Amino acid sequence: MRTEYCGQLRLSHVGQQVTLCGWVNRRRDLGSLIFIDMRDREGIVQVFFDPDRADALKLASELRNEFCIQVTGTVRARDEKNINRDMATGEIEVLASSLTIINRADVLPLDSNHVNTEEARLKYRYLDLRRPEMAQRLKTRAKITSLVRRFMDDHGFLDIETPMLTKATPEGARDYLVPSRVHKGKFYALPQSPQLFKQLLMMSGFDRYYQIVKCFRDEDLRADRQPEFTQIDVETSFMTAPQVREVMEALVRHLWLEVKGVDLGDFPVMTFAEAERRYGSDKPDLRNPMELTDVADLLRSVEFAVFAGPANDPKGRVAALCVPGGASLTRKQIDEYGNFVKIYGAKGLAYIKVNERAKGLEGINSPVAKFLNAEIIEAILDRTAAQDGDMIFFGADNKKIVADAMGALRLKVGKDLGLTDESKWAPLWVIDFPMFEDDGEGGLTAMHHPFTSPKDMTAAELKAAPENAVANAYDMVINGYEVGGGSVRIHNGDMQQTVFGILGINEEEQREKFGFLLDALKYGTPPHAGLAFGLDRLTMLLTGTDNIRDVIAFPKTTAAACLMTEAPSFANPAALAELSIQVVKKAENN
């Protein structure tokens, strides 16, 4: 039906007869001439109808936005004065000789001249996806997956599918359960990741595996999360953590070069401890120049409990954040930042406004200055390298609250004051995570997942001091987003059972949930390591949007609903009966 795409016509096509198929993006009726912007997935081209083709001109008068049409005509060069530099096809236009209206469109529920609500866009997603910016994002996503497949194939990886209907295993979030009709009362789980299957593939001898795969997690959603999402899943045998990072870094550098024309260069490597200390985050945005500075040792003897308490507590921390030019902040802005850090558990926000260092105490403005002598203040200014016109904010509490609150404040202030260089790309690897973290109930939980290997520890050493264990894990971070994470896996049965035990999984439960894995570990398991990238998040970064729903064709809302199909929906009672399922309504409180 077509010979060319609208958006691909150029000066090289001048004089050619072409047939185009697409939609009316806009129509302009000048009486004797009618112009339309005709759109398809590749872009927009101007088509015009003149009186010499009377039948086509008459039919064109009926056109409205989003009519689906076919046009045959001749490509012509525009006059110099009519060239549109804002359009890829702006140097040419098509003189229509024939027009076919394939399908008319009712009054549109979306307004192309105004910003539509996200709810409306999701309800009429098939219309929203016609917009050039949305089409471009999905084209970029398709290009990314194509580049990934070619790269992985060139590096000896095999694309192997793993099951969608599997067994529920504890991986951190709730599972989506699928009832079995054949096995009454039993349920499959949709996979949160192919983690165990890809490890089993390593045990099967397929030493380089990858898959672009759907994963499912029934968790509370945020703006950058979906209940179903896509991973670029990778696993290798007989490769060390640095070797895995080298190949995966090469993949991401390849994507940025091909999609953005940007060479990311070598990625710096930073430990978890350093990232938390300097940036208050395990996914630091290195485009922001500000860092946290420890000042507890300067404040242990002050008669100000807010500082002295955490400064003398082994689990406490006092950190300073020097904000270049921050002395210009108003009292209202400072109060707003004080309320902001309370979201993260901080009790407030102390500060020193540096007006003129040379004047000593008279050159600063601070509600806590009365608790600090000139010598201590000077030491703080020296350590933070504060200059005239800067602001120093303080966080004082337990280490986690200080990291969370001051790390978030660093990001917010950096954005608010334009200190974060939005034109840069800042990738890095974060390594050496704690293997376990406090679960809040006196126990431990795996920081990544229970199949991550400890670094340089035997099973006996791990059992004796799990709180000291460092995971042989690594995350890739770009511009403050964790785009991928992985680890060296446990390939020894004793070590795996030790980790399960530390996590409070008794032997009976181990056999029930992971018996197949423990059995497989008995038969010559190779050392293996892997990583998974979030395809949605990678695409988000490469297309310049901060909304993950913009890079998924048919996404869910933050309530995990599809407004277009109205999923989830109630099931047919007969279907439920066949599955031996009964829906029980909770009694309302009187």
UniProtKB/Swiss-Prot annotation:
**GO CC annotations, alphabetized:** cytoplasm
Give binding positions for ATP: 217-219, 226, 482, 534-537
Q: Which GO terms describe its molecular function?
A: aspartate-tRNA ligase activity; ATP binding; nucleic acid binding
Q: What is its main location?
A: cytoplasm
An example of a Pfam family matching this protein is tRNA-synt_2
Catalytic activity reads: tRNA(Asp) + L-aspartate + ATP = L-aspartyl-tRNA(Asp) + AMP + diphosphate
Q: Which PROSITE patterns match?
A: AA_TRNA_LIGASE_II
> Which EC numbers does the record give?
6.1.1.12
Could you tell me the keywords of this UniProt record? Answer: Aminoacyl-tRNA synthetase, ATP-binding, Cytoplasm, Ligase, Nucleotide-binding, Protein biosynthesis
Domain of life, per the record? Answer: Bacteria
A GO BP entry is:
aspartyl-tRNA aminoacylation
- Where can this protein be found? Cytoplasm
Give the matching InterPro entries: Aa-tRNA-synt_II (IPR004364), aa-tRNA-synth_II (IPR006195), aa-tRNA-synth_II/BPL/LPL (IPR045864), Asp-tRNA-ligase_1 (IPR004524), Asp-tRNA-ligase_1_N (IPR047089), Asp/Asn-tRNA-synth_IIb (IPR002312), AspRS_core (IPR047090), GAD-like_sf (IPR004115)
- The residues that cross the membrane are none
Region labeled Aspartate — which residues?
195-198
Q: Which residues bind L-aspartate?
A: 171, 217, 448, 489
Query: CDD domains from the entry?
Result: AspRS_core, EcAspRS_like_N
> Matching HAMAP family, A to Z?
Asp_tRNA_synth_type1
> Family, per the entry?
Belongs to the class-II aminoacyl-tRNA synthetase family. Type 1 subfamily.
> What function does this protein fulfil?
Catalyzes the attachment of L-aspartate to tRNA(Asp) in a two-step reaction: L-aspartate is first activated by ATP to form Asp-AMP and then transferred to the acceptor end of tRNA(Asp).
The entry describes its oligomerization and partners as: Homodimer.
**Protein name, per record:** Aspartate--tRNA ligase
Species of the source:
Escherichia coli O157:H7
